[in-house]
A protein has these predicted regions:
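TPR alpha-solenoid repeat register
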Residues: 18, 51-52, 86, 119-120, ...
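Residue-level recognition of tetratricopeptide repeat
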Residues: 24-25, 57-58, 92-93, 125-126, ...
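Short helix-capping/linker turns of helical repeat alpha-solenoids
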Residues: 14, 46-49, 79-83, 114-117, ...
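Alpha-helical segment of the N-proximal tetratricopeptide repeat
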Residues: 14-42, 46, 57-60
Length: 252
């Protein structure tokens, strides 16, 4: 009788693992978030700890259910099963939804130290924007680039850091172009300014100023530079003054 009970327990454990694996297959390979989540919740309710963090990731990333996702991340942490990519996702949730910089960085550092390369660029961005730790931010941006995971938002802030903090206009161009070409709209105006002021590439600069305006993100400094380009390079004083006025109205 004892042996039969043991075999039954092992069979249940195997079944739960199969349920978890099917959930991950549905989510990652078949891109069926709803069905994948359903299987993972079944596995989690049966006590399969590996599912906790995955549920948190799906709820946050795919369904934007931050509070429920946080409950699953906390559950994973309490059971010592918060794996690196879940720690990363939890850190980003805390940053964007809770505004808790220190707690966010704690989880991002935890994930990065365990090899989650996705965290590198975001750590650099937060250190730069929120803590003004320029040199440390620079190191994390470099780590992200070396790991081939410097994605558009981090590339933009890396380029911005190089312009604003280091005065390295030429070097910044590479990162601003990367961010802009990958569709990060915040980069458009900055790229236009660098191309105009540093490279004197008038046509290319104007193209990016126009893209920034079309995207509704032509901010005051770039509006000013666009206005000056129109006046000095195109002789279009009327249009140029409109952009200078916009920059002035926005406090530039």
């Amino acid at each position: 009788m004892g042996k039969k009970r043991k075999r039954k327990k092992r069979s249940i454990a195997i079944d739960v693992k199969v349920i978890y694996q099917r959930g991950m297959q549905l989510y990652l390979e078949e891109e069926n978030n709803f069905a994948g989540l359903k299987y993972l919740l079944r596995a989690a309710k049966a006590g399969y700890k590996k599912a906790y963090g995955e549920i948190g990731i799906i709820l946050h990333r795919e369904k934007n259910e931050a509070d429920e996702a946080e409950e699953w991340f906390k559950k994973a942490e309490k059971t010592d099963s918060l794996f690196p990519s879940a720690a990363y996702e939890y850190g980003m949730l805390i940053y964007f939804k809770k505004g808790d910089i220190e707690s966010s960085l704690n989880y991002l550092f935890q994930s990065a130290k365990q090899g989650c390369e996705l965290a590198y660029g975001d750590i650099g961005t937060i250190l730069y924007l929120e803590k003004n730790e320029i040199n440390e931010a620079l190191e994390w941006f470099k780590k992200a680039e070396e790991a081939d995971c410097l994605f558009a938002p981090a590339a933009y802030y890396y380029g911005l850091l190089l312009v604003v903090e280091k005065g390295e206009w030429s070097q910044s161009l590479k990162y601003l172009q990367k961010a802009a070409r990958e569709g990060y709209e915040m980069a458009y105006g900055e790229l236009g300014s660098v191309l105009y002021l540093e490279k004197a590439e008038i046509d290319e600069a104007e193209k990016w100023f126009k893209k920034a305006e079309d995207a509704g993100c032509l901010h005051a400094p770039h509006a000013y530079d666009y206005g000056m380009l129109l006046i000095k390079e195109r002789g279009d004083i009327e249009r140029g003054n409109r952009y200078l006025d916009k920059a002035a109205e926005d406090g530039y």
